Amino acid sequence: MEKGIISDQKIWRVRPEWPFLLFLVFVVAAYLGLLLLLVGANMLTVSWSQASEILKDADIQHSITLTFVTCTATAILSVLVSVPVGYLLSRYQFRGRALVDTFLDIPILLPPLIVGLSLLILFNRIPPSACCGMLAGGALIAAIWGAARKGNGIVIQFLVGSAILFGLLSFVFAGSQRSLEGIVSEVGFPMTFHPLGVVLAQFPVAAAFAVRTMRTTFDQISPRYEEVAMTLGCNRGQAFMRVVLPLAGKGIVAAGTMAWARALGEFGPILIFAGATRGRTEVLATSVFLEINIGNLPGAAALSLLMILLAVSTLLIVRCLAGRGGAV
Amino acid sequence: MSGGILVLEQVTVQAGDFVLSPFSLEIREGECVALMGPSGCGKTTLLETVCGLREGPVGGRVVLDGLEVKNLPPGARGIGLVPQDVVLFPSLTVREQIEFGPKLHGWKPEEIKERVESLARDLGLEGLLSRLPEGLSGGEARRVALGRALALRPQLLCLDEALSGLDEARHDEVLGVIRKMIEREGVTALHVTHSKKEAEAIADRVVVMD
């Protein structure tokens, strides 16, 4: 045998790779094929002329505008909430953290319809005194629980203060027969069956997704940055603002985009809480529903395609940000 | 024990399952002490306790320049830290890294400029002031971290295995810079290291933790 050449007997037998590769390709192709068929079905149902006709409809144009405005408002609100919540969950170890974490995931786990139903009941059936009473009770239980487990003094003081405040408000509203909707309408922010209600209906689920994104973002930023900043004279807040927030920029954009996309797909809560009034509270998701209801299948398909286009563009932005090495 | 710029008296730390046995140490003003010991003996934990970065119960006394600092936040202790993983702020240029502390403490712009330029000259960073950390080599990044830690003229400089991960040539170069800067700035230093050679090269005294 020549030196440097391995004889056939010395080569270990390895089974061929192609069956496994074929299995992977089959599963991926089957799944992508299904998605392609779903999009294709819509495309084959509508012609260019039908699509352009429905997009010229004044009510549909209002619906598209309202969709953009409400999704953007929901995304901004979601980011404003998700940044501090995500940071708290990422950086602070406290008793009851798992409970808070689970509670924040509830909007993701629940059927969206229940969010709408809960909002409808809260704003129209529960008197403000009961709302304040519930908040006071919740804050009091959390304060007692925190005190029993020797939790952070400032947090416990805040909870006790909140319990007292909501307790007092509960007494103030005790005689009132008005609903929460009555009160917010009086101060100029009507919610139920009103465009503002669309944002409120979109917000819980969109914010829950944004919180998840922000938490992952902060988890990926080493706490060492804050520690070094703190040795240089920062307090936690300054370290967050000067060091962590600039690093979380791409994550914030991703959280906002994710919230925007979730808000775009929201349907159940909007239908129940804000309604689907043409030219008033109608958004793209409800437009599809209304077009089906009046038997205009090509119109519904054209709007579906528009929503698919928007969703795909949004997801591409997120993927693009993640691909550029952002903490997403 | 008294008179040292840093006095640790029977310091104990509990961090999760790890408990640091009572440890005492005194460092005189201007002295450079190397702290050595096997992995997991608590060198970094002790350093972080001195810097105020450890959350959790700390026993004993941590005295800096005659003041008990156990309950002071990290930024109020007057300590400069060069961490093992360097931790330069990714979005700030080299100049902004060094300015970070002085700006935060409200130094006048001309004082900041003068301090940054003086440190950049001493550390050989003059040509790098507008660069971001991603464009720096390991040795340059260490020198920037040293400049950032020294900018506020701390009373104690803590170096946590600041030379780990550097190749031999860079290691010796940065070691020389650290030694020079400690002498030039007249700063008291606590240097945590694994390397006996490094400890002997840099420190006036070597303390071994069990």
Predicted segments with their positions:
Chain B
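The feature captures the beta-strand-to-loop junction immediately N-terminal to the Walker
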Residues: 36-38
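ABC ATPase NBD coupling module
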Residues: 68-81, 104, 109
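Short helical segment in ABC ATPase nucleotide-binding domains corresponding to the A-loop/adjacent helical element
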Residues: 95-103, 113
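Conserved ABC ATPase signature
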Residues: 132-136, 140
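Hydrophobic anchor residue at the start of the ABC signature
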Residues: 146
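A short, proline-enriched helix->beta-strand linker immediately N-terminal to the Walker B motif
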Residues: 151-155
